[in-house]
Amino acid sequence: MGYVAKIVYDKDNRVTEENDAHGKIKEMRNRKRRIVAATEENKEEILKLYKIQLGREFCPWDDSYPGMKEIEFDLGRESLFVMIDGQEINADAGSKEDRIIAAISIDDDPQVERLDCWSHKLAPGAELSRLAVHPDFQNQKIARQMLVFGMEELARRGYKSVHFLVNKLNVKALRSYAVFGFDTVGECSLFGQPFLCYEKGL
């Protein structure tokens, strides 16, 4: 049986130690991550996070989308959320540097909402979209954490289901999302890419 990594959190949800694949302890005492609603002050940093995704495999985004228009649209509906990584620069002085490392939105895209594959029995439903994770923080299951948060927020707002699109060729993403038990309810071609339509009751 292979070694299972273990992460330990303190009472403030701060990672205090992590076992690597060799069983060694990695000290991470000065790091804290949290998911919060984005603010006007976050706009430029979120835009940079979006732009750094351009050119990555299976990314359908371009220079114009998503842009400041989408960020302001999401902020205006209180539907944009970010994960902040806070790491102390000087433990003695207590100074910190916060960095946005992921984002997700509750979208309202007419093209997606018009698809006839969404279940009427699970209405009202909403789309989670514009999920982005900084390349420096890939392979840490952050995308899953953002989806869990997004689904919890949708449930809090009274939605009965969540739906979103995943590139059907993106095997890594498909494997990552498989743990949630989404139903594949259809396929579509949008933004020049083939997508699977995922849906799940909340």
Regions found by a protein language model. Give the residues of each.
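Conserved acetyl-CoA-binding loop-helix of GNAT-fold acetyltransferases
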Residues: 133, 139-152, 175-179
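Conserved beta-strand-loop-alpha-helix junction that forms the acyl-donor binding cleft
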Residues: 164-174, 190-194
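A short beta-loop-alpha structural element at the N-terminal edge
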Residues: 32-48
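Hydrophobic adenine-recognition pocket in adenosine-nucleotide-binding enzymes
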Residues: 38, 131-133, 166
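Short linear proline/tyrosine/threonine-rich motifs used for host-factor recruitment
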Residues: 15-20
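Conserved acetyl-CoA-binding loop of GNAT-fold acetyltransferases
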Residues: 178-187
